[in-house]
Curated annotation (Swiss-Prot):
<feature type="modified residue" description="Phosphoserine">
    <location>
        <position position="39"/>
    </location>
</feature>
<dbReference type="GO" id="GO:0005777">
    <property type="term" value="C:peroxisome"/>
</dbReference>
<feature type="binding site">
    <location>
        <position position="187"/>
    </location>
    <ligand>
        <name>urate</name>
    </ligand>
</feature>
<feature type="modified residue" description="N6-acetyllysine">
    <location>
        <position position="118"/>
    </location>
</feature>
<feature type="modified residue" description="N6-acetyllysine">
    <location>
        <position position="175"/>
    </location>
</feature>
<dbReference type="InterPro" id="IPR002042">
    <property type="entry name" value="Uricase"/>
</dbReference>
<feature type="modified residue" description="N6-acetyllysine">
    <location>
        <position position="185"/>
    </location>
</feature>
<feature type="modified residue" description="N6-acetyllysine; alternate">
    <location>
        <position position="23"/>
    </location>
</feature>
<feature type="modified residue" description="N6-acetyllysine">
    <location>
        <position position="278"/>
    </location>
</feature>
<feature type="modified residue" description="N6-acetyllysine">
    <location>
        <position position="36"/>
    </location>
</feature>
<dbReference type="GO" id="GO:0004846">
    <property type="term" value="F:urate oxidase activity"/>
</dbReference>
<feature type="modified residue" description="N6-acetyllysine; alternate">
    <location>
        <position position="10"/>
    </location>
</feature>
<feature type="binding site">
    <location>
        <position position="170"/>
    </location>
    <ligand>
        <name>urate</name>
    </ligand>
</feature>
<feature type="binding site">
    <location>
        <position position="262"/>
    </location>
    <ligand>
        <name>urate</name>
    </ligand>
</feature>
<feature type="modified residue" description="Phosphoserine">
    <location>
        <position position="63"/>
    </location>
</feature>
<feature type="active site" description="Charge relay system">
    <location>
        <position position="23"/>
    </location>
</feature>
<keyword id="KW-0659">Purine metabolism</keyword>
Length: 304
């Protein structure tokens, strides 16, 4: 028999702002076998539930709590019975399950991150069951659904590291008594892309295709044409160009947030050794680093 404390006294000086609980980093590898041709999705999933009462906080009464171990088991079972066509669809399946199965669950938040496995391929021939880990951008999604509404779906790319050795500069910036940074017309530009976007609705969206399209736009606007590149006068301009092209080509996207750290590579001074280093040997610096962010959304008139 469950016991809980009944010595609660109302406190008029504090109130709840938000509550939630759940299970983080539930890892599964789902294998879809079509004869000898196998497809895989490996994911790490985190689930947060909000209940319609707070008796577990106020009284220590656990009678409404769905154990986090049950949440973990549910994620695994849904992977078995629903499969993982896309991580966004999988996250929506999790939201739908908890809202339809438990009347006292009023909000579900799901974060899913996909491990970047890529099928072995040689001369256009794809291997039937072998994959290689390719860290060229991690696909993640965040889905939140209230009992009274549709799911709100975000997808994103993170840990996409890119570098170019020229076609970037930084000039004309504000200078004061503390400025020591020289203007530069030509420099290395390196960053690790974090890009997250929101869908205006989740019906009839090919989430995998949209993710690949955004990733392609990021690479296109960063690198430019393969034979000559594209000049970047600032990290801010490159960030904005990615957003504008993404929203112009992908009508399913409502808004987009991007964060770009400016990862520095500095020329090593070899003059004390009697050598002139012409930007051939650079020193990578992990920190400190600049970080540039920006979020854009469609204007109301653009939706009409």
């Amino acid at each position: 028999m469950a016991h809980y404390h009944n010595d609660y006294q109302k406190n008029d000086e504090v109130e709840f702002v938000r509550t939630g609980y759940g299970k983080d980093m539930v890892k599964v590898l789902h294998i879809q076998r079509d004869g000898k041709y196998h497809s895989i999705k490996e994911v790490a999933t985190s689930v947060q539930l909000t209940l319609n009462s707070r008796r577990e906080y106020l009284h220590g009464d656990n009678s409404d709590i769905i154990p986090t171990d049950t949440i973990k088991n549910t994620v695994q079972v849904l992977a078995k019975f629903k499969g993982i066509k896309s991580i966004e669809t999988f996250a929506m399946n999790i939201c739908e399950h908890f809202l339809s199965s438990f009347n006292h669950v009023i909000r579900v938040q799901v974060y899913v991150e996909e491990v970047p496995w890529k099928r072995f391929e040689k001369n256009g021939v794809k291997h039937v069951h072998a994959f290689i880990h390719t860290p060229t951008g991690t696909h993640f999604c965040e889905v939140e659904q209230l009992r009274s509404g549709p799911p709100v779906i975000h997808s994103g790319i993170k840990d996409l590291k890119v570098l170019k050795t020229t076609q970037s500069g930084f000039e004309g910036f504000l200078k004061d008594q503390f400025t020591t940074l020289p203007e530069v017309k030509d420099r290395c530009f390196a960053t690790q892309v974090y890009c997250k976007w929101r869908y205006h609705q989740g019906r009839d969206v090919d989430f995998e295709a949209t993710w690949e399209a955004v990733r392609g736009i990021v690479l296109k606007k960063f690198a430019g044409p393969y034979d000559k590149g594209e000049y970047s006068p600032s990290v801010q301009k490159t960030l904005y160009d990615i957003q504008v092209l993404s929203l112009s080509q992908l009508p399913e996207i409502e808004d987009m947030e991007i964060s770009l750290p400016n990862i520095h590579y500095f020329n090593i001074d070899m003059s004390k050794m009697g050598l002139i280093n012409k930007e051939e040997v650079l020193l990578p610096l992990d920190n400190p680093y600049g970080r540039i962010t920006g979020t854009v959304k469609r204007k109301l008139t653009s939706r009409l």
